[in-house]
Amino acid sequence: YFCTVGMSVYNIHKKPVSVPNVGKVTLTELLNSKKYGKIYIMLGINEVGYKFSNTIEKYSELIEFVKSKQSDAVIFIQANLHVTKSRSDSDKVVNNTAINGLNAELAKLADGKSKFYLDANILFDDKTGGLSSNKSEDSTHLYAKYYSEWGKWIIRQTASLIGEG
């Protein structure tokens, strides 16, 4: 996993990240280190306050960069998860209207051939369309106990889209 707190499409190339069983590497070094069959990208929640067109341009550039390093890899663009209705209703920046707008633009980056869009919000949303309040302590982040369910869902979706797990 190439991830760190605060990572965004604006800073993903800027500093090395500690990757389990690999060490501290930049994204370029990681992508050059071996051939990947599938690459899952989930960025955007830290960008919700930025102008969407700039964020989507940077996201598109990131996908093209990844494709240039891993031309045979299938890329899965993951939707940003919603926040709870209470957080959404009280936050002018990080709210479900903004998240849905960003996710809609991210979905357009998928081509259904080598780039696919995955939206796991159906797993965790309540009837209001926000993150279920019983699945988050801070109204923003999913409890870790749901990660396994999320991972299994991703495997099923991957199999459904490209015929393998």
Language-model features and meaning:
Residues 1-61:
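Conserved SGNH/GDSL esterase-like catalytic core that processes O-acyl groups on lipids
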Residues 1-4, 77, 119:
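Structural signal for conserved beta-strand scaffold positions within catalytic alpha/beta enzyme cores
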Residues 31, 66-68, 107-110:
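N-terminal cationic-hydrophobic initiation segments that often serve targeting/anchoring roles
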Residues 41, 76-77:
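Structural beta-sheet core signal
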Residues 45, 79-81:
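Residue-level signal for short, function-critical loop segments
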Residues 59-64, 103:
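Generic structural signal for well-ordered alpha-helices
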Residues 70-74:
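A short helix->loop->beta-strand "cap" motif at the edges of active sites that frequently abuts
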Residues 82-165:
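Catalytic His-Asp segment of secreted/periplasmic serine-dependent ester chemistry enzymes
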